[in-house]
């Protein structure tokens, strides 16, 4: 009997030991991520997703696309999310955040520095910089061209001023972003191959970064105003988030597009007499040559607006 009892005790001891190891391993695996998530929270976040999940799913079926959404009402901390932690190619949305990094790392006077570039530096879709090869442009004008006109050469110059794609990634890491991967310059970063994590992020992470730059403490007030004014003047987003909000709402946004039907828009939106709303909507399709749908972004925005009223 004593032997059986000892065997039984041994089995119990082994089970407890394995359970202890499992819990320890789980903590080791998730602890870092949980700590990062905790650092991102600035207040109690209230989620409102039950009513919107079905609507976003229906939009995916309607447009034959995958959609990632994250929105936060900065006045109430209510959030809307859908596939908010899934990766999407960020495409040209990075230009607004890279402009924020540029402002973070440089004085406002630096924006008056004249940057010269050659015809060989030009890449596809550079409607502003291609007109100034002979004269160069002020750094502030280049940042504005990247944000407002989505000028790709301007985007590359922004990258160069902050240490390249990896310099951009490093700056975001310092802000608590352990998600965004930035690897390539324009225009290769728009390749957007499904499953390729290069030049990708999530709707939640992008919205969190945009919030930090536009209403948070990542920039002082004077620099925040410069960035948001650039975004308010965006010339490429009229059919996107702007099309999904009431006409009396003010929108500052940055769009993006790429292969595989990639269409994105990120924005800070000011409803009348309310705190701003931060919105990130990312989308993609399965086929490389698939056309993107601006209307998908507009209708996803309508779902967000209705849910946050």
Swiss-Prot record:
- Record-level GO BP terms: beta-lactam antibiotic catabolic process; response to antibiotic
Q: Which PROSITE patterns match?
A: BETA_LACTAMASE_A
Coiled-coil features, chain-numbered ranges: none
Q: Which residues form the signal peptide?
A: 1-28
Q: What reaction(s) does this enzyme catalyze? A: a beta-lactam + H2O = a substituted beta-amino acid
| InterPro entries xref list | Beta-lactam/transpept-like, Beta-lactam_cat, Beta-lactam_class-A, Beta-lactam_class-A_AS
Query: What EC identifiers does the entry list?
Result: 3.5.2.6
Source organism's superkingdom? Bacteria
The top EC class, named as a word, is hydrolase
User: Which terms are listed as keywords in the entry?
Assistant: Antibiotic resistance, Hydrolase, Signal
Record-annotated residues binding substrate? 254-256
- Which residues are the active-site ones? 92, 188
Q: Which GO terms describe its molecular function?
A: beta-lactamase activity
Q: Which Pfam families match?
A: Beta-lactamase2
Q: What else is known?
A: The class A beta-lactamase family has a specific amino-acid numbering system, sometimes called Ambler or ABL numbering and often misspelt as Amber. A multiple sequence alignment was used to derive a consensus sequence and then the consensus was numbered taking into account insertions and deletions. This allows use of identical numbers, e.g. for active site residues, despite differences in protein length. UniProt always uses natural numbering of residues, hence there appear to be differences in numbering between this entry and some papers.
Q: What does this protein do?
A: This protein is a beta-lactamase with a substrate specificity for penicillins.
* Sequence similarity: Belongs to the class-A beta-lactamase family.
NCBIfam families (alphabetical)? bla1, bla_class_A, classA_firm
Q: What is this protein called?
A: Beta-lactamase
Report the source organism.
Bacillus thuringiensis
